[in-house]
Amino acid sequence: MASKRYPLGIQTFSEIVKGNYFYADKTAIVYQLAHYAKFHFLSRPRRFGKSLFVSTLKAYFEGTKELFKGLAIEQMEKEWTAYPVIHLDLSCGKYYSLENTYSILNGILEIEEKKYGLKVNPIDEKSFGARLKNILLAATAQTGKQVVVLIDEYDAPMHDSVSDEDLQKTIRNIMRDFFSPLKQQEGNIRFVFITGISKFSQLSIFSELNNLKILTLKDEYSSCCGITKSELTQYFREGIEEMAEHNGLTYEETLGQLKQHYDGYHFSINSEDIFNPYSIINALDDKEFNSYWFTSDTPTFLIELMQQKNLDMLNLDDLWIQASRFDTPTERLADPIPVLFQSGYLTIKGYEKKGKLYHLCFPNQEVRQGFSESLVRYYSAQDMNRYDAIVYAYSKNVLINDDMEAFMPHLKAFYDKFPYTIINNNERHYQAVIFTIFTMLGEDVKVEHTTSDGRIDLVLKTDKSIFIFELKYKKSADIAMAQISDKDYAKAFADDGRKVVKVGINFSENQRSIEDWVIIHCNLALYHTPKSS
């Protein structure tokens, strides 16, 4: 059993230190940030360690030196000045109505007002900006120090009101007033740090903070949240070893599986690989490679917006776009890409300097598989019987019995019941759906696989077989099969050791489904020259 505990659901730095929990030391970044600028903003996905980082900043600025014993910052900080800290956590409620919004903000400010003996006249209860200003003034007057302001999940009110345009507009005005003293009282402020998931227009809330430093895409702060590989092996080695023993794997094999499932985030051009901290901690605690961060309830509006913009799994796993396309305000929801990036469904995988183009992809298997599952549920029109049927049919016929022929009627039945509203009647759409289904099932699947003789529409690899798919629209399955044979696609896999199966499928324009298919098992002996005696 591990000598330390995993901080499941714990986001308070002092509790982690005092409770002997596993902790990846981020204090060197805390010191660097504290001496960088005055106003800072950081966007990171949900459950990615933002609140813990804010809590660490709070402990540092409060001068609690004893909490940092043995950590990097202990050797860096010499003064340990204690500042008054105002911590505004906006994630502590749901902003589904004006009444809720007023109640939550009132409760947040009351906590700070009590610290400085401030009493509020009921008539001024909703004057949130004036109340924050009075807190700042009182903190400075009573301590003789500049104030540190930490704002966690600033965008929670916006996310909760996204489906009600009028409510969101009203809340935006309330929040603009709420935060207005930050600029007005700049002289009394030592440091401001604001976190959130989304990048809402700066003018919409922080209208006067024209010197706000955006840290989201900066290399030097790319690992302030999340866990790097070096941190994982340094601080969590004991847990990895236990997980390896539990699963009958080596240490390196376990590390590889953790990387495949939960690694792959990049928040800047030169960012090192970042593991999802929520998933890693839960996986190590359970000693299982399950899905933790990704929830199956991907917002329907996001998938519908993808449909409107003709975006599918094929697009999302290979996007080349400029930063202005994804690092942009999201409140209008006209483009799903910024939401997908800022929410953690997509991440930076590369950068082409000349064209200033970023390569966006899914970060890892957990997200890729989870997102495809959400899409398949959407394709199923949320009919769980259809969803369960396709999963069961694939598992039984392909994974267990290695029988693609037996699976094809089930795949056809899945297409037969597609709502017309989500069908783009073309070959690419049908290719995207098959790709999404296989991806959802966690399979090794590639589209447009390049060989010396052309590009294969789709290649599916299981433990037993390699399936080569050629898809046609308004033609015939025989024509699809002829292309596989004429271009000799199977040759590329002749030395793999698994069986190779050719699958030709034709889709009907009128039926909007699979019309016919042909399956042929390859004779791989044809590709091997007999040894001379």
Give the predicted meaning of each segment.
Residues A492, D496-S533:
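Domain-level recognition of nuclease-like catalytic cores that cleave nucleotide substrates
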Residues F178-Q185, P338-L346, F435-T439, E443, ...:
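Metal-dependent nuclease catalytic cores in nucleic-acid-processing enzymes
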Residues A139-T143, I437-D463:
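Active-site metal-binding core of divalent-cation-utilizing nuclease and nuclease-like domains
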Residues Q168-N173, Y473-A490:
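Mg2+/Mn2+-dependent nuclease catalytic core
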Residues M1-N426:
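Phosphate-binding site recognition
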